[in-house]
């Protein structure tokens, strides 16, 4: 099994351990030689910023050492893992399905098209963030979140205009720190009262 993982992922060792307990040989594909073999295993060095080249590198590895399954171990590796599985004709979710689920604004569009309820929202393009004309259209409280991060990273409630402006700036900084290749758009959506699970 091929695990596609960033070198800083805390999940990789758990997946390798689970594979060992099940008798499954694991190989790690990562964007750093340091993260390739936490247990001395061979690995495949890939560039997460260029998925096409990453898929080709893994395809070349597969030609020498066949892979029977591919698994992305965190949100940022799921699309590459799905693309690899598709290229190698392995079972997996389709890359477009992964992207639609990961990118919050795309997921909201799909839910609306299907007639399912979801919060009202607005997508801010990076160039819109410095222009405050749209702020008058916002209802408070609202929630600010990056379209591309998971695990509640960058999700901030804003109760008034000043908090909204500060939240947008904070999310921009989080996105820059996380990965320079991430989608920079920000979602501003209706706040829905209730328990978060």
Spans of model-derived segments:
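A conserved helix-loop-beta module that forms one wall/lid of the active-site cleft
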Residues: 86-154, 161
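A short beta-strand signature within small-molecule sensing/ligand-binding domains used
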Residues: 196-197
């Amino acid at each position: 099994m091929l695990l596609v993982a960033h070198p800083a992922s805390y999940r990789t060792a758990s997946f390798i351990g689970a594979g060992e307990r099940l008798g499954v040989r694991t190989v790690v594909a990562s964007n750093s030689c340091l993260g390739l073999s936490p247990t001395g295993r061979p690995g495949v060095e890939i560039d997460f910023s260029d998925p096409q080249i990453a898929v080709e590198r893994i395809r070349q590895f597969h030609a020498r050492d066949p892979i029977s399954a591919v698994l992305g171990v965190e949100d940022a590796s799921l699309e590459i893992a799905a693309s690899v599985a598709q290229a190698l004709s392995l079972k997996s979710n389709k890359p477009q399905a992964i992207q639609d689920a990961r990118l919050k604004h795309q997921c909201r569009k799909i839910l609306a098209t299907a007639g399912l309820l979801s919060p009202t929202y607005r997508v801010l393009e990076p160039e819109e963030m410095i222009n405050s004309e749209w702020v008058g259209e916002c209802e408070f409280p609202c929630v600010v979140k990056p379209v591309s991060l998971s695990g509640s990273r960058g999700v901030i409630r804003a109760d008034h205009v000043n908090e909204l402006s500060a939240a947008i700036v904070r999310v921009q900084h989080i996105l820059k720190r996380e990965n320079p290749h991430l989608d920079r758009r920000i979602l501003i959506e209706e706040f829905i009262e209730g328990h978060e699970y």
